[in-house]
From Swiss-Prot:
Residues 186-206 have a biased composition (Pro residues). GO terms for biological process: chorion-containing eggshell formation; egg chorion assembly. The keyword Signal applies. GO terms for cellular component: egg chorion; extracellular region. The lineage of its organism: Eukaryota, Metazoa, Ecdysozoa, Arthropoda, Hexapoda. GO terms for molecular function: structural constituent of egg chorion. Its main location: secreted. This is Defective chorion protein. InterPro entries: DEC-1_N, DEC-1_REPEAT. It comes from Drosophila erecta (Fruit fly).
Amino acid sequence: MRLYSHLPLLALLVVQAVGQSQVTSEDPARDAGSTSNSTAATRPRIPSQEEILGQMPPIPPIRTGSPQMDVFYMMFPALGSLLRWGSLFPAQSILGAMPDNLQPEAAASRVVLVLADDATAKARVVRQNPPLNPLGQLMNWPALPQDFQLPSMDLGPQVGSFLAQLPPMPAIPSILGAAAPVPAPAPAPAATPLAPAPAADPPAAPVPDAAQPAILGQAALQNAFTFLNPSNFDASGLLGQSAPTFAPPNFDFVAQMQRQFFPGMTPAQQPAPAGTDALASDISEVRVRPEAPYSQEAQMKIKSALEMEQERQQQAQVKDQEQVPLLWFHMPTTQAQVKDQEQVPLLWFHMPTTQNQDATAEKTLEDLRVEAKLRAFERQVISELRMLQKEAQRRAGNSGMNSQKANALKRQAKSQEQALSKEDIVQIMAYAYRMANEQMESEKGKQDKVYAAYRTEQSPMTMEQRQWSEDQAKIQQNPQQIQQGPMMMQQRQSAEDQAKMQQSPMMMQQSPMMMQQRQSAEDQAKMQQSPMVMQQSPMMMQQSPMMMQQRQWTEDP
């Protein structure tokens, strides 16, 4: 438990001790004699909240090693103090340890055993234990310290007892001392005269003990190579014999020696009993789960289960609402109860009260100080929680907007990734060229119309003057035609009349009066027009030079 976490509590205790000493420093006799707190000398003054907060010791900066946690504790001191007090609470010793089924580490195991699909169908293969390594057993002695010294002791009895406790070594068939094979009988030599029997030898003297080992060694050497003769090395006999079978070596005496001399040492690897050789296991493979604690499939299952539970609750609520009777009796509630329920804050600190305590009793200075500090702490915690709630809502809104933007960008990128064929490209280019040409033509027509409207609005009189000047130029160029005009018109009219008369003699006979009247009317109209033209011609001739100059001036830019 860290010491700096107790500093705020120690400072609070010091402040309370100082306040108690100030209150108890008054005259005890005066306090005992007075029955009420109405006098100004005995009744202490209730300090304000600012004074109480000013008397609190400064909060030392918390250095947990994590910059994020340090910044959080500095920005939210009330919540930081709650977290520190919660960490100091001995929850495991009072409430007990958390069970394994509730711990996420135990639930998210990384090793998964995959069993075989059909264990009986697979071939049963006997598991072979690896052979023991005697060299490893011999080298498995503990390392001796550098200053290790053996005590001086008499090892005679111990060695004798050890040799007596040793297990018997495996018996190896010895070839030493074997009886020599009987050689083939040699041919009998010639008969010789029998020698007289020798006299009985005197009893041999006892051989001293020192000469017995030499005699035994000589006998062993004499009997060692007696079997090395040609008769024993018969090829046909050796091939017909079976190879000698030796008992397997027993390495257990090494472990026995190790247990005898070093009782506290871990014994070497012991060979498994014959009955423990089991068959092959049904586990086909062992897989390792990835580092992700919860996969997407598990999250989807959890989400679907939660949604189903919510739907079930909603259906139950709707069913309960439908079963509400027509007549519902409400218990009468007072306005005070409703007001108290509405004014309950987010965090409510209930002070321990007793039934016999009088509500009108005067509170001591320490109680008032504690209540004021608790109220200030409550307001601070509520304000910090509201700030955190607003920040969480703002971040949730920003994340939603960012996800919408990301989805929009993804949709745009997906539409742009579609490949276009050559025909699509040609159609798009043709459409672009056609639209460009139509746009140019429409703009050109608009410009012409605008220019024509501008010209007509700007100079309507100049257009009339231009038309009149053109007419005057034509009249000036052909004055003789104007003079000869009436005669030529009469001749032309007479020629046309004659042609018509020739084409329609019947019409001439039927309506001679109509033809004469028509001819007389036309002649009179022509005679009336000709004097007016002749009178206007001199005036036109005089005005023509002025009109030509005006036309030239208007046409020049």
